[in-house]
Amino acid sequence: MALHMILVMVSLLPLLEAQNPEHVNITIGDPITNETLSWLSDKWFFIGAAVLNPDYRQEIQKTQMVFFNLTPNLINDTMELREYHTIDDHCVYNSTHLGIQRENGTLSKYVGGVKIFADLIVLKMHGAFMLAFDLKDEKKRGLSLNAKRPDITPELREVFQKAVTHVGMDESEIIFVDWKKDRCSQQEKQQLELEKETKKDPEEGQA
């Protein structure tokens, strides 16, 4: 859904930088460092996506809101992904792991038994990142935006809109979610409290 990822070409950077270097400072294909992973280790909000793949587009249209937590493992180059989707006013939770390809600057995920990839595009000054996928395919390409805050600035929205047009899509293809329709915050809170209690119990038993 928010993080469906497929291998992409690397022509995005020059197109974006040529548009307006003052407001768009984007790199693609940069190696993923420990610093990048530490920065990614946080709670993120799926803001929206422009997706031409009809199956993915249909899934996003049904989604009212998504937030997720990323927890990298620096030893085995994986990242735990915990997603909270609000669909039809109900919360749907999912947990999985992403692979990290440091040198290529990509993340990977198994979907339907197939390993797929996406380039990570870091927008650190905006507290956001994009995932670009399948840009070579005119019928399936897509670009998603994720941020540390659900209420993004007009500047970040403009950066995303320009990126979408530069990869060959129209702004009208963008589907933004509505963070005010969140139905998962309470469930996340309960899960975190339960995990704290679970961690506490073994320690008390050893005391």
From Swiss-Prot:
Residues 1-18 form the signal peptide. InterPro entries: A1A_glycop, Calycin, Lipocln_cytosolic_FA-bd_dom. Expressed by the liver and secreted in plasma. One of its GO terms (biological process) is regulation of immune system process. Residues 188-207 are annotated as: Disordered. It holds the Pfam family Lipocalin. Glycans are attached at N25, N34, N76, N94, N104. It is found in: Secreted. Disulfide bonds join C91-C184. Contains a beta-barrel that binds various ligands in its interior. Functions as a transport protein in the blood stream. Binds various ligands in the interior of its beta-barrel domain. Appears to function in modulating the activity of the immune system during the acute-phase reaction. This is Alpha-1-acid glycoprotein 2. It comes from Mus musculus (Mouse). The lineage of its organism: Eukaryota, Metazoa, Chordata, Craniata, Vertebrata.
